């Protein structure tokens, strides 16, 4: 990923930290992970009028981050510790589950 400005809603960041114990400032570091993988967020709950992406990247531990692109800015929507299946996808140990994930730019 090229250098981009990272942004997020401070209130959403606070709520996210209370729920998942992941700070958005830390989550922003996943975009610097050269091994980061991503996929389009096609989850049922995604009803936004914007393209959302899911990414897995290492920041002390593997994080699962949902974000969107707004011009030259990357806006973090949510972040949490990756679950077992997502970790296997990140490490490349689950070829079947890696479907849809691709190496990030």
Q: Where are the regions a protein language model picked out?
A:
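Ribonuclease/tRNase effector modules and their secretory precursors
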Residues: 1-105
């Amino acid at each position: 990923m090229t250098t981009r400005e990272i942004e997020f809603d401070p209130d959403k960041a606070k709520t996210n930290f209370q729920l998942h114990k992941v700070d958005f400032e830390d989550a922003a570091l996943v975009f610097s992970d050269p091994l980061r993988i991503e996929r389009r967020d096609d989850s049922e709950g995604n009803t936004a009028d914007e393209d959302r992406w899911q990414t897995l990247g290492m920041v002390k531990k593997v994080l699962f981050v949902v974000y969107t692109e707004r011009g030259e800015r990357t806006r973090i929507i949510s972040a949490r510790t990756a679950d077992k299946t997502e970790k296997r996808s990140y490490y490349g140990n689950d070829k079947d589950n890696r479907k849809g994930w691709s190496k990030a730019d």
